[in-house]
Amino acid sequence: MDAMSSVDESSTTTDSIPARKSSSPASLLYRMGSGTSVVLDSENGVEVEVEAESRKLPSSRFKGVVPQPNGRWGAQIYEKHQRVWLGTFNEEDEAARAYDVAAHRFRGRDAVTNFKDTTFEEEVEFLNAHSKSEIVDMLRKHTYKEELDQRKRNRDGNGKETTAFALASMVVMTGFKTAELLFEKTVTPSDVGKLNRLVIPKHQAEKHFPLPLGNNNVSVKGMLLNFEDVNGKVWRFRYSYWNSSQSYVLTKGWSRFVKEKRLCAGDLISFKRSNDQDQKFFIGWKSKSGLDLETGRVMRLFGVDISLNAVVVVKETTEVLMSSLRCKKQRVL
């Protein structure tokens, strides 16, 4: 995780994000193919947000919006007296709408917002289906509307998954299975521990995830990599090079992946790439015991085969127990 980030992505609760200042130019964002965003950072691979000093800049007419020295607008919300940064936007009303989205997720339908409540049940369902940290992440990366629209396209008028969505899910799984295996890595205790980062073997990193050149042919210090899992969920990881340890690492976003997949030391992570023009990246995982956690759809509980897709609650509860026992057993040994 980035050194200056104070939102724990592996939790549904949100910590404060302190104001950060820098005299360096604002970060530049580039697109590389369909699955990569590159960030030219000002320092140490950290995206820098600058909060305006109220005594120097005029205040906004909107709640939760603060002006920035570069003419843009920042959005923020407070929870338990701690500030949560929601990102920087070109227009003042964009920042205000970002605040409204966060307010609905943090405080419910009765939250005080800048604009008249136009949140429909479908959007409420979308908000409730994601953790606070996930919504904050979408707002910061300006992907909230896109992901909400995608959710709407995948539902029919009755709120059920469309046939097109079911077919798309089959395509995702097929693409995952036929993708080219780039490399695998057995995760170490530090990879799944409190350091919140995954070290990528240097030769694999330079071969498959080379950092592009920025100004003066100097490699940029970090970029965002997108990976799809077998279920079609997109995981965004910050990928950078640490001079201190001379290693390539996945940081921001990794801790959430570890928690959701309940990874333990000794588990196997695989990285794949599609063979089509999109060149999408995929990520898979298997337990140390050899159980394929990517495709397991049925488990046997008390002598009965239970569909994990149909009984989500049983799936989540059982996986938590199994993962907890699996990790504890490794520690004892």
Curated annotation (Swiss-Prot):
<dbReference type="GO" id="GO:0003700">
    <property type="term" value="F:DNA-binding transcription factor activity"/>
</dbReference>
<dbReference type="Pfam" id="PF02362">
    <property type="entry name" value="B3"/>
</dbReference>
<protein>
    <recommendedName>
        <fullName>AP2/ERF and B3 domain-containing transcription factor ARF14</fullName>
    </recommendedName>
</protein>
<keyword id="KW-0804">Transcription</keyword>
<feature type="region of interest" description="Disordered">
    <location>
        <begin position="1"/>
        <end position="27"/>
    </location>
</feature>
<keyword id="KW-0936">Ethylene signaling pathway</keyword>
<dbReference type="InterPro" id="IPR044800">
    <property type="entry name" value="LEC2-like"/>
</dbReference>
<feature type="DNA-binding region" description="AP2/ERF">
    <location>
        <begin position="61"/>
        <end position="116"/>
    </location>
</feature>
<dbReference type="InterPro" id="IPR001471">
    <property type="entry name" value="AP2/ERF_dom"/>
</dbReference>
<dbReference type="InterPro" id="IPR003340">
    <property type="entry name" value="B3_DNA-bd"/>
</dbReference>
<comment type="function">
    <text>Probably acts as a transcriptional activator. Binds to the GCC-box pathogenesis-related promoter element. May be involved in the regulation of gene expression by stress factors and by components of stress signal transduction pathways.</text>
</comment>
<keyword id="KW-0238">DNA-binding</keyword>
<dbReference type="InterPro" id="IPR016177">
    <property type="entry name" value="DNA-bd_dom_sf"/>
</dbReference>
<dbReference type="GO" id="GO:0005634">
    <property type="term" value="C:nucleus"/>
</dbReference>
<dbReference type="GO" id="GO:0009873">
    <property type="term" value="P:ethylene-activated signaling pathway"/>
</dbReference>
<comment type="similarity">
    <text>Belongs to the AP2/ERF transcription factor family. RAV subfamily.</text>
</comment>
<dbReference type="GO" id="GO:0000976">
    <property type="term" value="F:transcription cis-regulatory region binding"/>
</dbReference>
<feature type="compositionally biased region" description="Low complexity">
    <location>
        <begin position="1"/>
        <end position="16"/>
    </location>
</feature>
<feature type="DNA-binding region" description="TF-B3">
    <location>
        <begin position="183"/>
        <end position="289"/>
    </location>
</feature>
<keyword id="KW-0805">Transcription regulation</keyword>
<keyword id="KW-0010">Activator</keyword>
<keyword id="KW-0539">Nucleus</keyword>
<dbReference type="InterPro" id="IPR036955">
    <property type="entry name" value="AP2/ERF_dom_sf"/>
</dbReference>
<dbReference type="InterPro" id="IPR015300">
    <property type="entry name" value="DNA-bd_pseudobarrel_sf"/>
</dbReference>
<dbReference type="Pfam" id="PF00847">
    <property type="entry name" value="AP2"/>
</dbReference>
